[in-house]
């Protein structure tokens, strides 16, 4: 299986090579080595890793320095990127549901996405979710609003939702009050490309499938 992981990562690296400058490609090779190390430590899986790599390509091309599975204040972020004094975090969402949540997949995924936004968005200037074209994320509308427009009722709903699945440690009211999702990357793995969506535009389309 290790060889298959390497083959798949190298396939993506080769596929994007022609789109990159020499310096950008050098940065991608460093990230490749990082992913292989993480795989040997059993910390990553291939579906997630190829999406991280494609997101990294997009960020490297726009001038960011990128780290994968970056430890930040006791939490591990999928992608942490810096450019000048600016920083951003990207969390990759594949839509995977573990067997333990076979009977509540929608609520579980909604809580997972909500928890990511509330926990991570405070640690960078910009917080982004990355997902695939075939998975429609269930994002609470209250997290799309500017924080100052979030009501106490909405804050309490988010708190209850997150605590139902993620209570170690629980998200704080302050984290919920200040959380913000800035944009969404839709990752086309087949073509190793990304389309960046404005959050309200994505939510408008996702509303057709919202349950």
What residues fall within each predicted segment?
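Accessory terminal regions of nucleic-acid processing enzymes
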Residues: 44-46, 77, 205-211
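Catalytic cores of nucleic-acid endonucleases
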Residues: 94-151
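Amphipathic coiled-coil/heptad-repeat helices and related helical stalk/stem segments
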Residues: 73-75, 112-113
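Non-catalytic C-terminal interaction segments of nucleic acid-processing enzymes
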Residues: 1-29, 134-211
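A structural signal for short, well-ordered beta-strand segments and their strand-loop junctions
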Residues: 67-68, 89-91, 128-131
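Active-site beta-strand-loop-beta-strand hairpin of nuclease catalytic cores
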Residues: 77-98
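Well-ordered, non-membrane alpha-helical segments in soluble/globular domains
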Residues: 50, 106-116, 155, 164-167
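Acidic-basic catalytic patches of nuclease active cores, encompassing PD-(D/E)XK
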Residues: 2, 7, 14-70
